[in-house]
Every structure is written in C-alpha cells, then in structure tokens.
C-alpha cells in the first residue's frame, strides 16, 4: 500500500522536491495517470474525485484531450520514511498544443514519457520527447495500459529504444486505470529525476509558466521559483516591463487551491497580485523583488509563432466589443493566440487571428461561442507567404485580399513543413499517394519492427486544412502526424477574387496553387449559386484572376408573369408589357443591392468543407 500523506508545508530541503511533466500522445492515458497519482497521494477524497480531474474545461472532457497545462503539488512518504514534495504538470498531446508542452518542460527537471503499451510510439510522442531532450530534461519511460489483453509491453519498449533512442527495457509498466505499478513509478520518479538546482539565498527569480484571467481576482499566474523565496505581501517586479505589484495571495494546487505564505526555491505555485491588465504578466517572463532585483531574466521556453491565420467576425455587429474583450482574456490564457482588428466590407468589423493549427482554431472558436455566447463567422485559414516585389522589397502577408497586384510580384514563397508520419506498413501505399497529392517530397523512410517512419516536406497550406483527417482516413486511424516549419520555397500561386454583380467580395478572396485554381474557383462559384437567394434581377457570380474570368455562374431573376391578365387582343399590348418589365429589371440591377445573408458566408467559409 502506498505511504502517501496529505499536503502540509514544511519541506525545506530542495533535495526533497521533484518537478516533472507527463508527456504523451492523445489518449495514451496521461490524464488518467494524473488522476491516479492525485487519488493515491490523498490530493482529493473519493467523493471529490472525477474522471480527468486536471482537464477543467468542458471542451477537454468532451473531446477527451488536454488543452491547457495543469499543475498539482502532492506529498509522498517513501519506504524509508522520507517525505518528498512532488510537483507534476499534465500537458496536452495534440500537435497543435506542443507549445503548452514546452512551457511545462521549462519548469521541470524530469518528464514521464507515457506510451500506450497496446499502440506503441506515435509521431507526437517522438516530437515531445525530442523537445524534452533538447531542454536537458530527464526522461522516465512509462508503459501504460498493461491491464488490457492486447498489451505488448516488450514490443513497445523495443520500439522506444529503436525509434526514440533512449533506454526503455527497464521502463515502468503500469495501469493508470487499476493502479498497478503506480508505487514503483513514484519510487522511480524520486530516484531518477534530479532535484531542482538554485539558491534560496539569491535574489528572487520566478518563471511565469502559465497565466489565466479570473473575473474576481484578476490575473492568476502559475510560477516556478528558480532562485530565492517569494513571500506574501512582497513587492515584486515584472522584469520585461519594470512594473511593480504587491503580492496579494500565493499558494499551490493539490489540486484544490491551497493558500500559503511563501513559495521557496524549486517550488511550483500560483500568485495573485492584483494585475488587471491582461498583458502585464506575459507567459515566459521573470518575476523578481523590487527591493533586491535579480540581474538577469530566466531564459524560458521558445515562444512559438502562429502557423495559420483566419478572420473571425461576430454574426451581429453589436457583439464586437464583447468579442474584443473575450479575445483579450483568451490571449492571456493562450500565449500563442495572436489577434489584430480587421474590417471587411462583407462581414463588418472583426479580428485577424493567428493559430497553431486547425484544432487550435476550432478550440478558440468553440470557447468564444460557449464561454462568451458570441456567434462567429470564420474565414478560410491561410498561412504566411514571403513575397519579393519587382522593386526588390520583401514583405510577409497572410491575408489574400491584401496581396499586391500579381504584375508587381517577382517571387511568391510558401512555407514548407517537415512532416513525420508513423504508420503500420500496410498503409504505406495510401499514405505516399496522399503525400504526393498534397505536393509532398519524400525525405526519408525508415522501417522499424512494426512501424514505418516517413518524412515528407509538404507545403503548410496543404497540411493545415484537412491533411490530418485524410491521413487518418487512409490509414484507418492508425497513422500519427507531427510537423515542423522548415523553410520558404518559391511557388506559382494565384489570387482568386470573387465578384458578385461586378463587386468584389473581400471575405471570399483566396490564394491557390495555379494548377488547382480552376477547380477551386468552380467549386466556390457553384456553391454560392446554390446558397444566395434569388432576387428581382439576375445575379452574376464570377471568379477572377488578374481581371480574367475563369469561372462564372448566374442566378436567374424572380420573374412575375405580367401577361397573366392578357387573355387575347393585340400582340403589341403584350410586347409593351414585357418591354416595360425588362426596362424595370435593368433599372433595378443598376441600383439594387444583392442581399447575401451571413449564413451564406458561414457555409462557404467552413474550413473542413473548403
């Protein structure tokens, strides 16, 4: 039986502290393992326990994924009777949330590499593990789900050694579901993961590893004390801005919020200091005391730039201010979310937002709609292009409607990503066909015992929309994907403008690879013809490249039968009525506006269908 105790402050020896992350692929059991550690170490009573304790967002529980990094502090008494203070951080596994993983690793000395013993190593496991190795974090391999009948721990241990290249034959074998092997795991954490380095007597240095906004308390920051001690009521300084604040509250999560009067060197906890401005405590910044400030900032994790961009517009204009405030609060929670105001003739006022991937975009949109009750229209996602103009100037653009005239452009370069795909060998042919269809170039192919590791360079524009879905489809769900930006490469792209009755609709302007331009244009034009309601006059829909129409369709007018009351008589009377109607339609077309409902844009701009 585990000898675990409820949290009580009093561990003054840094050698008794262990800070570690749990990194793994989606659905390999990291959140369940976190729950088991909390339950067995007395963090919560049986009544307070629920599945996925650390996945606090409803979206996380619904999708069965972890989005935000969560921290917990528990105490453990080992077999020798010594008390150890364990701080662990549950991290996401999806490729779009890798920045959360790097953030957690910056606060740790060790990481549990959790691998499902029924599935083996996945591409994202590989990426996260290499990130941990680059950050000099001690890796402890853990083979989970050994209680399942199809578990093959020996095979998976060999896979870890072959593919990742770290020793794994003595990896901890456990079941987060039943609790088997958890005691051995905790002992391994204590023995293998090094204690924090730092000096309790040095000036305070605290790394902000996460922040979120509380409607009542303001900004709450999760911090790791690298040097010194932080006391309640201390006057602290944010080193990047030089601004000073008084500490109102400090404490730890057990996972319940527990107030303390100090945080010591090596510990991970939360801090509230009355910050109301959501950009005043940026993630990755360093806190120090105003009285005795540290000389240097802590070198934190690499700040990750957005990979894709899309326009977000409220369905009704009266929600704009609420939308702006909501984005401000979400951006504090999410260091990679970028946004700036954007104005569209068709969609009104909104924001141009930067995301790490399509899932990241969907999560942000879902949170805005659910937590803030804002109905949104999202434009088709695009990537950043490097453009060299005729005059030699180089610019970077992500908005198709802002692209200069094609005659002024010398070279367009698109971002290329290196995709690492792990799959069983039987799906290799289908995956290679898919990569070729997406304009991919094969870099490497390595056969391991039961899996093949494929490396392809593919344009990011092809990857961000539905490549992941198609990959899962052709591999029956077995293939996994991880990608990383490599370089810009010249490409022949064209800008397609959509015109309705000769008026350009900026929200529908897209960039396309020149060979796909005709089919994409025809697809959008045909879709619009079905969705736009008929008017009293003809509506022409055109797709245009450099003033040349490459696709066109016409929505025929609604036409009243003006001859319904003419039962006979002179034919000139009928001609006169028809001519009068024709002249009226001409006048109406000149002065009439085409009413395009916003629901039409919602349907056309659906990224999955586009």
From Swiss-Prot:
**Membrane topology per record:** Peripheral membrane protein
Q: Is Aminoacyl-tRNA synthetase set as a keyword in this record?
A: no
Alphabetical UniProt keywords: Cell membrane, GTP-binding, Hydrolase, Membrane, Nucleotide-binding, Protein biosynthesis
Enumerate the subcellular locations listed in this protein's record, separating them with semicolons: Cell membrane
Q: Which residues form the tr-type G domain?
A: 15-197
Gene Ontology cellular component list: plasma membrane
Example GO biological process = positive regulation of translation
Q: Which CDD domains match?
A: EF4_II, EF4_III, LepA, lepA_C
Q: Does the keyword Membrane apply?
A: yes
Q: Give the matching Pfam families.
A: EFG_C, GTP_EFTU, GTP_EFTU_D2, LepA_C
Give, as one word, the top-level EC class.
hydrolase
One example GO MF annotation: translation elongation factor activity
User: Which InterPro entries does the record cross-reference, listed alphabetically?
Assistant: EF-4 (IPR006297), EFG_III/V (IPR035647), EFG_V-like (IPR000640), EFTu-like_2 (IPR004161), G_TR_CS (IPR031157), LepA_C_sf (IPR038363), LepA_CTD (IPR013842), LepA_IV (IPR035654)
Please state the Enzyme Commission number of this protein.
Answer: 3.6.5.n1
The entry's function note states: Required for accurate and efficient protein synthesis under certain stress conditions. May act as a fidelity factor of the translation reaction, by catalyzing a one-codon backward translocation of tRNAs on improperly translocated ribosomes. Back-translocation proceeds from a post-translocation (POST) complex to a pre-translocation (PRE) complex, thus giving elongation factor G a second chance to translocate the tRNAs correctly. Binds to ribosomes in a GTP-dependent manner.
Q: What is this protein called?
A: Elongation factor 4
Encoding gene, per UniProt annotation: lepA
